[in-house]
Amino acid sequence: MNIINTNLNFKQMDTRSSTQRIILHHAAAKKCSAEDIHRWHLNNGWSGAGYHFLVRKDGTIYRLRPEDKVGAHAYGANYDSLGICFEGDYKEEIMQEEEIKAGRELVNFLKNKYGINTVQVHKNVNATNCPGDNFPFDQIANSNETGVSKPSQEKGKIATIQTSLN
């Protein structure tokens, strides 16, 4: 699994003190990039992209908001959760295997890293239909894969710093 660091510029963010759950979302857009989401959320007056990760349709995973920062993805649940957004509109579309596989790998990695047992969809915590009725929750969240490897990092300033801190 490879996680690409986006190096997005954020405004001031609070540090999250605990990680108890993962909340899954869809972008409600058939096509979008990390930069699109960041711009949309800045235009909402937020610090930047509210999700911690974006999984693209081709299976590429992007790190958006730093993992240790409070998200802006699920009102009332941001202080103890990580948010993962999946490119697509799963009210209408059917997720393809590349995106399912990448999402499953990311969820399993984060569950192992943080000792998380709780994975939810946005509509479990807020009055919304996100991530849509076609979202393959069981295929992504309820996998019992073990031995998930640490993700490789694309070379870059943040990846280099993270590697040196590990």
PLM region spans:
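A short, structured beta-strand/loop element
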Residues: K69-A72, A77-Y79
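Conserved PDZ fold ligand-binding element
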Residues: N166
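Basic/polar, cationic surfaces and motifs that engage anionic cell-wall
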Residues: M1-I23, K57-I61, P66, D80, ...
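Secreted/periplasmic proteins that engage bacterial cell-wall peptidoglycan
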Residues: D14-D68, T163
